[in-house]
Amino acid sequence: MRKSVIAIIIIVLVVLYMSVFVVKEGERGITLRFGKVLRDDDNKPLVYEPGLHFKIPFIETVKMLDARIQTMDNQADRFVTKEKKDLIVDSYIKWRISDFSRYYLATGGGDISQAEVLLKRKFSDRLRSEIGRLDVKDIVTDSRGRLTLEVRDALNSGSAGTEDEVTTPAADNAIAEAAERVTAETKGKVPVINPNSMAALGIEVVDVRIKQINLPTEVSEAIYNRMRAEREAVARRHRSQGQEEAEKLRATADYEVTRTLAEAERQGRIMRGEGDAEAAKLFADAFSKDPDFYAFIRSLRAYENSFSGNQDVMVMSPDSDFFRYMKTPTSATR
């Protein structure tokens, strides 16, 4: 008897344990009975908020959905700007489940991979459209914040964008099919949502960010070569200007040297002329005071200059006036 009571107590405890489930903070729970979702009066799946809840053991199971903000990294992709220039854009998306019932039905049981595939394709389509309306300068500077904001709003609202928007019908069709599935599951009791928006999947895009923007390899090399050519042209221009300035300085220096030498030569000639004139004046004054003595001195200097040379032979007439002071010393008095 005692063993039976213990067994019953154990069974009751196990049943109670299996009848209780806890939805953690940051999660939501959806109950399935025999594999089918429990629904409310509007035929929408029942969603359990965080807390302690009960279920029928062995009959009902609970599917947990993550209510936290999810981050989805996008592979760097090539986009074309308004200027028909290619850019490699690396980005990520932050999203969360805004309508758990719709999300569960639209994704075929809360399949996060299916939701992210649709979100990624729609995001790529929307980002391609926005980048196609901007030039490179707007994308990499002031317009980046506005660009991501417009992409986020377009994803949430389902905006069709401008006439030149590049669309991916497959993604939109998949979202539209998911929205139709939700309508069919709920028998039209849920509000109709724009099938082009992510709200049709029960998803809200919280944030869109561009991590980095790069140029394709071939474009980067072309820009590098152009920049190098421009720098080399600037260097050549500076070298040419330097050589021109050097030539100017050398020409100026040569001119100054020539001018200084010419001026010195002119001053020297003037001074020599003045000296010669002064010497001539002195000679003239001396000659006027004693012409005979002056003539005698001049003759002595002539003798000295004549006999100091290397030649030891002089051919002259004996009657030459050159020897008058040698013949007759008194000739100085004539």
UniProtKB/Swiss-Prot annotation:
Xref: InterPro entries: Band_7, Band_7/SPFH_dom_sf, HflC
Top-level taxon of the source organism: Bacteria
Subcellular location: Cell inner membrane
Sequence intervals crossing the membrane: 3-23
Alphabetical UniProt keywords: Cell inner membrane, Cell membrane, Membrane, Signal-anchor, Transmembrane, Transmembrane helix
This protein's record includes keyword Kinase: no
Presence of keyword Transmembrane helix: yes
Alphabetical list of CDD domains matching this protein: SPFH_HflC
Parts of the chain on the Periplasmic side: 24-334
Topological region Cytoplasmic: 1-2
Family assignment from sequence similarity: Belongs to the band 7/mec-2 family. HflC subfamily.
General remark: Integration of this protein into the membrane depends on SecA, SecY and SecD but not on SecB or FtsY. HflC is unstable in the absence of HflK.
Function of the molecule: HflC and HflK help govern the stability of phage lambda cII protein, and thereby control the lysogenization frequency of phage lambda. HflKC inhibits the SecY-degrading activity of FtsH, possibly helping quality control of integral membrane proteins.
Subunit structure and binding partners: HflC and HflK interact to form a complex, originally called HflA, now called HflKC. HflKC interacts with FtsH; complex formation is stimulated by ATP, and with YccA.
Entry protein name: Modulator of FtsH protease HflC
Organism field: Escherichia coli (strain K12)
Organism lineage: Bacteria, Pseudomonadati, Pseudomonadota, Gammaproteobacteria, Enterobacterales
